Amino acid sequence: MAYPGYGGGFGNFSIQVPGMQMGQPVPETGPAILLDGYSGPAYSDTYSSAGDSVYTYFSAVAGQDGEVDAEELQRCLTQSGINGTYSPFSLETCRIMIAMLDRDHTGKMGFNAFKELWAALNAWKENFMTVDQDGSGTVEHHELRQAIGLMGYRLSPQTLTTIVKRYSKNGRIFFDDYVACCVKLRALTDFFRKRDHLQQGSANFIYDDFLQGTMAI
């Protein structure tokens, strides 16, 4: 297997949307979209904002500017119960969630970005539950390898070991840390992908560009 590899969209697993049960596939809306030459299905927004529960959660904490900062996002996600039986997301995880989708560099998140995050979180949660076969509420090294593979990424054993050491506690990765890993993996891959003009797994960029792209996550 060649390294490195790139995942597409949120991975090859179903995305939960309001009105659908966890695990129910999203109806097909057309062929898979190739993202800048990288394989994998692209995410598409499959529901409207008007009157749905996602908007209710968001608007309950959003400021007058219609956006949320990290503390407001943390409160919103906790109140929504999206984490299920797992511990609520930490403030640091909420910060990098915002950074992942902060395309206008405001340090906040509007509703469209929140919908995108909501879909990603449900997909990552389903993926976590799929690989947590013993129901321990954590994933181990081999389960994380499976989860990352399901998302379409092809990582070297050395990189996977580095990720496990970074996000695990006594060899086990809890849901909040797992989501933080997914956020960073997606954000850094997107950052690199935009600069890999030939789509060959290599890119050149200046030091300041590198710092701007990585220090925000």
Curated annotation (Swiss-Prot):
It comes from the Eukaryota. GO terms for cellular component: azurophil granule lumen; cytoplasm; cytosol; extracellular exosome; extracellular region; plasma membrane. It is found in: Cytoplasm; Cytoplasmic granule membrane. Ca(2+) 1 binds at D65, D69, E71. Keywords: Calcium, Cytoplasm, Membrane, Metal-binding, Repeat. It holds the Pfam family EF-hand_5. Gene3D superfamilies: 6.10.140.900, EF-hand. Its main location: cytoplasm. Transmembrane segments: none annotated. It is a peripheral membrane protein. Ca(2+) 2 binds at D132, D134, S136, T138, E143. GO terms for molecular function: calcium ion binding; protein heterodimerization activity; protein homodimerization activity. Detected in neutrophils and macrophages (at protein level). Highly expressed in bone marrow. The keyword Calcium applies. Calcium-binding protein that may play a role in the adhesion of neutrophils to fibronectin. May play a role in the formation of focal adhesions. This protein has been shown to bind calcium with high affinity. Homodimer. Interacts with SRI and LCP1. This is Grancalcin. It comes from Homo sapiens (Human). The gene is GCA.
